[in-house]
Amino acid sequence: MAKILGLSFFYHDSAAALLVDGTPIAMAEEERFTRKKNDAKFPQNAVKFVLNKANLKPEDLDYVVFYEKPFLKLERIMKTNLSIFPLAPQVFIESTKNLFLKKIWIREIIFKNVGVPPEKILFSEHHLSHAASAFFLSPYEKSAILTVDGVGEWAVTTIGVGEGNNIKILKEIRFPHSLGLLYSALTAFLGFEVNEGEYKVMGMAPYGKPKYVNEIKKMINFFDDGSYALNMDYFSFDRSLKTPYSRKFIKLLGKPRNPKSKFFTRETGWPSYFGEKPQPEEYEKTAVEQERYADIAASIQAVHEEAVIRLANYLHRLTGLDKLCLGGGVALNSVANWKIIKNTPFKEIFIQPAAGDAGGSLGAALAVNHIALGNPRNFVLKNAYYGDSYSNEEIKEFLTKKKSKFRYFENEKELIDVVAEEIADGKVIGWLHGRFEWGPRALGSRSILADPRRPEMKDLVNTKIKFREPYRPFAPSVLAERAEEIFEMPKARNHFPARFMLYVVDVKEEKKKIVPAITHVDGTARPQLVFKEESPRYYKLIEKFNDLTGVPLVLNTSFNLKGEPIVNSPADAYSTFERSGLDMLVLENYVVYKTT
């Protein structure tokens, strides 16, 4: 019975995943414990958690696997650094120093922090880790595989085939020609943080029109085999520590957006929570400026979708398969994912919820288990609940120390009745139940819940509770068997990505007025399908809300404030509750009320 620990760290979203006999036992990102968003440090807390969950000690492990090969990465960075040394000596000095001080000493760092002997420490290639995390957890015996991200060692995109317990990479695109880094450059240009703000670009895009597609296509060349190449004259990510785009990029698209600027358009109007409305001349000028940035966001999203669809269509021509597994950070672009279903011959897609670098930890463990050790597959990932959990006894002790006003429910039905009634009455609820989610989405274990029927709920949750940008959409959690009534998603229950909020689909025309709080400006939503067998308490809550309102879904957003990771513990949840406009906090069987 192989016990394998997978690790990812030192880039962003460090994580640990434990595999026992081919089955994931526990998985978590380090940020959930340190409360530092996108924490890249060695995942000491996550390692401790996953081992404790399985009652294992380091000496019980058969292997510890790192999600990429440091010396292949060293080769790429050194060759890149040497090629740009005369132009950017500071980049050469800083990145080389960073490499030699820590990033190539992975075996020693794992030995020191985990305590396993060096011969038990293995390495998987970055994109193989992504491919393994996608394919080996899927329900498919054989499928096409597409991985796309910023950069691994050399590869930025791979296409391949998975069959049984093997993966064959057929082709790859290499650095610097990265679709992920193209999207990240536009993310930075639009005033957001790279490796964190890409989903904000996706949220801003529907407010604009793709007017700048031709300009962005000057930055990328498409070829008949689905591949592409960047025009590096527009980029500086290979030679700058500060900005990923060049002066030529700015000359083409204009002044970068100020990260502190307020986003609104003439169509949306000036949101009341922005404060005093500017004078007409300033209002018009600012609106036009922000609309231009929305148009640029819409344009990069359109070009990104075209690139992914081209790759997928070529992969289908190459393999003839109708099932596709997606991996890498680009697989978190839920708008593009659904476009693959609509615009290629692929009939089914599988994506695991932590498709980015955090999930590479799990993929590395899977690659060793199935490819290196030859163990057969025996597991399909149907939910994302692999984090830590807390007992009612622990919660009672915490709340008693806090001298909080709370109520305990012995009976689950009574608890659900009360919470569903509060949501239907317009209250916004913080909800903590069971093990926290693997990946960046809140899926009913660490969620903020509200009534999707109320149009004002979108602004209320954004500004008084989440303290975040007003253009960010909210997702619905819907009873799986009722999803097709609300969304344009035929055979909804068959779509695995919808379990993990990884598809954006159209809301049916006649339903948009019924659920305005989860309907984005372009008439779409990013639903989570909730299955009774996977999330029984959450399912019952939505079921009760449906009994009260006739609407089989609730508004669900991640339980965190702007700039913070999703909550892990009752203490995290309580802190967020105290610092926000949440009306009620549910911690397992305890309901906590605001004290006046």
Describe each PLM feature range.
Residues M1-L5:
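Extreme N-terminal starter segment of soluble prokaryotic enzymes
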Residues F9-A26, T34-K37, I77-V91, N98, ...:
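Flexible beta->alpha loop and helix N-cap segments adjacent to enzyme active/binding sites
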Residues R32-L56, V308:
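N-terminal phosphate-binding loop and adjacent alpha-helix
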Residues V47, A54-K57, D62-L87:
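Glycine-rich nucleotide/cofactor/substrate-binding loop typically near the N-terminus or early
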Residues K48-D62, N113-G115, A312-T319:
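Phosphate/pyrophosphate-binding loops at sites that engage ATP/ADP/AMP, CoA/4′-phosphopantetheine
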Residues K285-L311:
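Adenine-nucleotide phosphate-binding core of ATP-dependent small-molecule kinases
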